[in-house]
Amino acid sequence: LRVSVKIACMLKTRQLKPHIAFLASNKTTVRHRGESSKKKKKKKTKIRIAGTTQTTRCSSFFDEEEESTSPLVPTTKNTPFVEKTTPKTASILTTTTKMMQFCDIGANVVSATGDTQFDGFYHHGSKRYHESDVVDVLERAHKVGVREILATSGTLDEAKATARQCRTWNTDGGGEKNAALPKMYGTVGVHPTRAGEFNDSTKCESPEAYVDALKTVVRENADVVAAIGECGLDYDRLHFCDKETQKKYFQLQLEELAGEFELPLFLHSRNSREDFYEILKRNARHLRKGAVVHSFTGSKEEFEELLALHDKVYIGVNGCSLKTEENVEVVKSIPLDRMLLETDAPWCGVKQTHFGTKYVPEDTDRIRAVFGPPLKPKKWHKGALIKDRCEPCHIVTVCQIVAGCKGTTCEDVAAACYRNSRALFFPHKDFGE
């Protein structure tokens, strides 16, 4: 009786979960934190799916490619995970044999752009909580399948710094390709809230000179510049720049930058539906190389009229696109062949208050399973995620929510959006695949 009571107590406190998981899959080697990691060979196990028995390799969701004919992706929950920084009962192990691939089409990872969270500064404060961990951030992204990242810029100075930093990240110390990080690209353009820089004599002597300087950045950095932008209209933050100035220099960038270079557009629109659409409609010829309206939070009618402008226009979806039930219903309606995934890191993260999180219960959160729960900045340590700081690796969470609301698989969403990203930004590049 005493033994029975003890076992019952252990079950209640979940102390037996690792042992039960081990017994349930006696052909799979389960390793706890602190144990030897020398034996890395994956065992084979039989998994029954829909009345059939398949032999497959038990592997982490993010294992590298391996040949397989099975399109199904079974999962095992509550299995002890081997990473030191994750909980003992991290929840997702799967038998998928091909890692999903992503292009994060919008992330603010260059500190010169004013987004300094990856340098350890938060809430626009002067206190530094930790050393720069941006390389760790990029390595995490690569680990979960992010193959390319577009680092956005919003001014002339930012465009220069972004191009320079992307080239640095793309090579290792010996000048060879850096295989540990995603391939980094940048954008060149002026954000609508910064459009006043065209009239700032401390930046350039005239708007025309400013545009010429932007063109020079594109020409001198053709290997890393993938888009014109971030340009457009933002009527939510008119305290930064008035409507007329925004419209004037949005038009100028379309004519001078999109008109000259064979590059797609990276577009921004906030609370500006009518003016944004009318300007694009008048300049439809400049959409010939395609465009993405990033971080979309508009209505179904709004994205439908934008997609109708050109068959190379896409809609970018991130955490801000998944806040409310209405937002999620809109995303549900966006055709997969016209959708791109992004994070807009360190902003636009998926928060627990967002409606979209209903599609990512904690025990199926793949990022949390791999890297552990996020910490407060003051508790940062190397390799840690930070609470409320979005990272490019969180594109997996965005993908999970999109798949959930559309009633399809993450693999299908990732494949479609990755195909779209390459078609838009890298149509002529040979990726050696």
What does each of the following model-derived ranges do?
Residues K6-C9, F22, T29:
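Short, low-structural-confidence N-terminal segments
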Residues R2-C9, L72:
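Compositionally biased low-complexity segments enriched in histidine and/or tyrosine
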Residues L1, K40-K42:
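Conserved small/polar residues in nucleotide/adenosyl-binding loops
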Residues K12-R14, F22-L23, R33, K38-K39, ...:
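Mid-domain alpha/beta scaffold segments of enzyme catalytic cores
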